């Protein structure tokens, strides 16, 4: 990422991420399509509303791996190979421990959280079953995300693509097998997801043990180096905290949707599944910009950073808005693929037509956050997103719904807070001194070493 044509480097790095996320989104949609078609709208509500709860519990740990990727990318760009080796093995060890913790926490807390979310009684038993099975296999999800961060930090987005394709195809086949033929219900959908996630984690691990560079995982070197873990956590914890608090805010939003009944849950759950396609350019360019920024700032190529970030921002915003326009036009047909109930379709289409045209500002926020994280300034995106997407969003919805009991009030909470965060990120991008952050970090580290 530090050499060659900027536009082609970013595009070629982002493209495999885009395609990989596309396949991942297909298998997320496949879960809901199979469940909605063969098990009915209550089961669809149980599965489709899963995103906010999963993000609440998984988002924190996976956010830490964003920090790991920044640290590895920084040392890789600076050619400090020994530190790259230490960071890779510390990340792997931490992934194993945190994945086991997440499994225990998820299985224990699922019933409590679902009840706090006002999950309707006709949906609750199936929701508990689905989530407990999902979190029983959380270790596979965490390990895959850790390995994915290592691949991306070394500038490799192709291999994660291959493994996602394999995982996605496996998930779709098992979904149909377990739900349609074995009659395992929502438990079959959860089991298919767990198996496919472990498969991608295992393949990624095997590949990283065979690569011939400083990112190679040597199993007997997998241990936590505490100074390195502190550095990873210092960079990644803000993103982890941000993910968890945003997840908590979305759980609160979901509980407001749940108050409108199982039709609203199913319709909005279906919308959230198709909304994932709008995140394809958002995620791919955000990750590409984080890696591009961390490597080039590590190599002190500041002009290259300016040109690359401008290209990434324009590309991510334009593609997200194009997808949003398609959603507005075809909303009823897209929601109707999951369940043909007129009430379910009405709720999902209403949400799509309220939010989709604002995907441009959502993409702008995420891409700018990716750039700033790549510079190691992870506290800034955390604070902006916590204030805008959590505090303001929850306060707006809680207060407004009390006076106007209309579900569209809940829907508007998203675009309003996306616009606020975009204003904040734009101001910091042009006014904040984020580009020279690594130099300050190196100066502090050298000063501390000299004192010792």
What are these regions (language model features)?
Residues 56-59, 171-176, 201-205, 277-280, ...:
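Hydrophobic transmembrane alpha-helices of multi-pass small-molecule transporters
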Residues 44-104, 141-160, 254, 267-331, ...:
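Small-residue-rich hydrophobic transmembrane alpha-helices
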Residues 65, 133-152, 160-168, 189-202, ...:
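Short runs within selected transmembrane alpha-helices of multi-pass transporters and secretion channels
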Residues 1-14, 72-139, 181-237, 293-358, ...:
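Short alpha-helical transmembrane segments in multi-pass integral membrane proteins
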Residues 12-31, 133, 144, 167, ...:
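Transmembrane helical elements of multi-pass membrane transporters/channels
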Residues 41-52, 131, 190, 262-277, ...:
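Small-residue hotspots at the loop-to-helix junctions and early N-terminal turns
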Residues 26-45, 114-121, 177-184, 244-271, ...:
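Helix-terminus/linker motif at the lipid-water interface of multi-pass membrane proteins
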Residues 3, 7-26, 30, 53-60, ...:
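Residue-level signal for short hydrophobic patches within transmembrane helices
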